[in-house]
Amino acid sequence: MMPLPAGVELEPLLAALKNLSWQAADILLAYARKPMELSVDKGGEGPVTAADLAVNKLLLDGLNSAFPAAPWALLSEETAAEQGSQIIESNEWLWILDPLDGTKDFIQGTGEYAVHLALVHQQRPVLGVVLLPEKQELWFGLLLDENCSAWCENRAGIKQQVQFSKRKELAELVLVASRNHRDQRLEQLLQQLEIGCSLTVGSVGCKVAAILRGDADIYVSLSAKSAPKHWDMAAPEAVLLAAGGGFSHADGKPLTYTSSSFLQAGCLIASHGISHPLLCERATKAMASIDPGFQV
C-alpha cells in the first residue's frame, strides 16, 4: 500500500473521479441509445467507436484540468500506440484508463460495458474506479496507506458495501465468463475446475462487479493468440483486492503493469477470495496437462 502522490489529497481526487465518471456515463448512455451514430472503426486489435473516443477525451482533459501539477502520467487504451512503452518505464505514478471496456458488448447492445480508471504506483494499482453506466454503479477501491476499502455508490452518492457470496466449495461456486473471448483450452480448464455453474457477462469490469455483488465468485482469463491489456485489468483488480478478494496469476503471483506490450498474459484468476488458493492450485495443475509449458 502507498500514499497518494505529493500534493494530491484524497477527497478532492475522489470528487473529481466521481464527476468525470458520471459525465462518462452520460456520454456512453447517449451513444448506446443511438447506435447508428457509433461510427465503428474495426481496424487494429478491436473495434473503436465514437463513444470510446469521446470518453477518452473527457477523461484525459478532465484529469489534466483538475490536477495540472500532479506528478503522474496518463495512459489510455486509445493513446497507448502513440505513447509507447516508455510511459510505463519513465513514470513512478501512472493513470491507466479504459474509456470503454467491453466495446463489442456495447456495440451488440447487451448493456454490459464499463469505464476503468486505475492509479498505478511503481507498476501496482493503488486506486481503482469501475463505472457501470447501465446499472448506475460506481465502484471504488483504495489500496492506500491511510485507507484500504471498497464500495459502490449510485449517482446520488448513496453507498453500498461489497457483498461477497458465502459460497466456498468449488462445486458451489458461480463462474462469470465472457461471451466474446472463449476457446477450447479455456473450456477444458473450466471443466477441470469443476465449478458449479456459470453466468455470461461482458466486460472485465462487469464481471468483477458481479463478484463484488455476490452474483458470481470467480472469473478466469486465459491468454491465447491475444491477451487482455493493462487497461482491462488494473481498475477491476484494485477494486477487488481492496474489497478483500483475490486477483492473481494461477501460480499466485500478482499482476504487474510493466510489460512494454501492455499485455496481461497467462492464466489470471479473480475471485471472492474464500477459495482463491485452491482455485489457483487446481488451475495450475490443469494447465500443466492442457497446455504443457504454458506460463500461468
Which residues does each PLM region occupy?
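An extended, acidic
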Residues: 163-296
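N-terminal subdomain of lithium-sensitive/metallo-dependent phosphomonoesterases centered on the IMPase/IPPase/PAP
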Residues: 1-100, 188, 275, 288-296
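Short, charged helix-to-loop "capping" segments that act as catalytic/coupling loops
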Residues: 63-77, 82, 144-148, 217-235
